[in-house]
């Protein structure tokens, strides 16, 4: 059976971030391997940067050795005390591991300001050390358990190589993607969501990945009325002079709890393909049938094939009842129209304690998982229909980890669009294929 740490996810993340964003790999656990410091050192020496965590009834304390433990060699030791979500530290100075762990005390003349005595299950430290760590003035702390971790880079060379390979695979899949049945040349994906959720930023991020540098074609902002006031349909080129990719991202005015957001009646017109690019939204009323941007007889290529709801991860818990009712109403309309829809969770990288290393397996990250479950609980989305992304906002350079999240979300949207096309009535598909064949043969 695998040996697991006693640390909670929160405490582990606090320690990781405090000591340089390292990933903790468990080497030794007293309750499993025994409370024998000699055995501990045999197992934990020459492992690189090392973190020792000691659990008592009332405290979590420990020691960090940046150079790691090496037999009879001095290493700089930093002591720490973790109390709830706060961590304090004290630079103890240079120690050999034999001194720190009370091995052969007589020979190495161990000082008494800090000792880890595994055999007697206690930590001894002087009053000054206690005070510097913010602990109660009790010179002896009983050990319930202790663990030693190797501190590894959260993004080592092997992981980075894997991310780069996955990025290449996703780019290839999206470049060569063909909509189901060749019924349309480009999939139309509508981005819907509250004002400021990151809809325009997601388009910019997708475009950045395929352009090879960070771009800002769509204006973004953080004010309460949003930036997108027009209906925009964005085709994206593969590179500066490349061909257009097989999808179009459609941006709209954001949803609002009060006045100023997207008029609900406009949504059905957008879905049906009745609204032309650059139509100026009117929050107070929907488009008029005689408007010059109204399309009378849209074809399948003009319709929306997938809807992606975009939500800011940091705002889900603050959704008002009005916003929840509005989103659920739109979802019902989409179901009635047969339009497949997914959810996109943005701004996850701004959540507390999230590091770049977490983005590789972001959906396993405890706080992100909590947000996914909150979207499921409040809005009814299946967990499998929710993607997590980190948009480009303040960066100057592309990041392969972010690219993988963005491309994976886009691929999921295209799969959803294929489901929509495949589910079209047989008669409609037959007529469309006949039109496609006639066009290919030059017939009218």
Swiss-Prot record:
Summary of the tissues where the protein is detected: Hepatocytes.
SUPFAM superfamilies attached to this UniProt entry: P-loop containing nucleoside triphosphate hydrolases
Subcellular location: Cytoplasm
GO CC aspect terms: cytoplasm
Keyword Cytoplasm found: yes
Protein name: Interferon-induced protein 44
Organism placement in taxonomy: Eukaryota, Metazoa, Chordata, Craniata, Vertebrata
Gene responsible for this protein: IFI44
Swiss-Prot/TrEMBL GO biological process terms: cellular response to virus; immune response; response to bacterium
Origin superkingdom: Eukaryota
């Amino acid at each position: 059976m695998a040996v697991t740490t006693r640390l909670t996810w929160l405490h582990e993340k606090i320690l990781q971030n405090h000591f340089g964003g390292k990933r903790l790999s468990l080497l030794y656990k007293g309750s499993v391997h025994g409370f024998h410091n000699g055995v501990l050192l045999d197992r934990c020496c020459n492992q690189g940067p090392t973190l020792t965590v000691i659990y008592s009834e009332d405290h979590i304390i420990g020691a960090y050795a940046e150079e790691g433990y090496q037999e009879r060699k001095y290493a700089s030791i930093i002591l720490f005390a973790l109390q709830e979500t706060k961590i304090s530290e004290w630079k103890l100075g240079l120690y050999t591991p034999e001194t720190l762990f009370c091995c052969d005390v007589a020979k190495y003349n161990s000082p008494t300001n800090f000792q880890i005595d595994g055999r007697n299950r206690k930590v001894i430290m002087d009053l000054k050390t206690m005070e510097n760590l913010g602990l109660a003035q009790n010179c002896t702390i009983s050990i319930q358990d202790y663990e030693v971790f190797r501190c590894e880079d959260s993004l080592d060379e092997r992981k980075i190589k894997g991310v780069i390979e996955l990025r290449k695979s996703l780019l290839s899949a999206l470049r060569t993607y063909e909509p189901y049945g060749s019924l349309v040349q480009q999939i139309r994906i509508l981005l819907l969501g509250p004002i400021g959720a990151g809809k325009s930023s997601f388009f910019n991020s997708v475009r950045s990945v395929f352009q090879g540098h960070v771009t800002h074609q769509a204006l973004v902002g953080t004010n309460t009325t949003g930036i997108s006031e027009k209906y925009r349909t964005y085709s994206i080129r593969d590179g500066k002079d490349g061909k257009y990719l097989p999808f179009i991202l459609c941006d709209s005015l954001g949803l609002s709890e009060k006045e100023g957001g997207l008029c609900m009646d406009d949504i059905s017109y957008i879905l049906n393909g009745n609204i032309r690019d650059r139509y100026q939204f009117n929050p107070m009323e929907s488009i008029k049938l005689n408007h010059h941007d109204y399309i009378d007889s849209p074809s399948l290529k003009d319709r929306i094939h997938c809807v992606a709801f975009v939500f800011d991860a940091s705002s889900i818990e603050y959704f008002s009842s009005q916003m929840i009712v509005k989103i659920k109403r739109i979802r019902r309309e989409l179901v009635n129209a047969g339009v497949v829809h997914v959810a996109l969770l943005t701004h996850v990288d701004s959540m507390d304690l999230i590091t770049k290393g977490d983005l590789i397996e972001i959906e396993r990250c405890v706080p992100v998982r909590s947000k996914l479950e909150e979207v499921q609980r409040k809005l009814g989305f299946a967990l499998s229909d929710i993607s997590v992304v980190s948009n480009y906002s303040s960066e100057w350079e592309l990041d392969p980890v972010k690219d993988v999240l963005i491309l994976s979300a886009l691929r999921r949207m295209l799969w959803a669009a294929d489901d929509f096309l495949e589910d079209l009535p047989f008669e409609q598909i037959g007529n469309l294929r006949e039109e496609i064949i006639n066009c290919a043969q030059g017939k009218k």
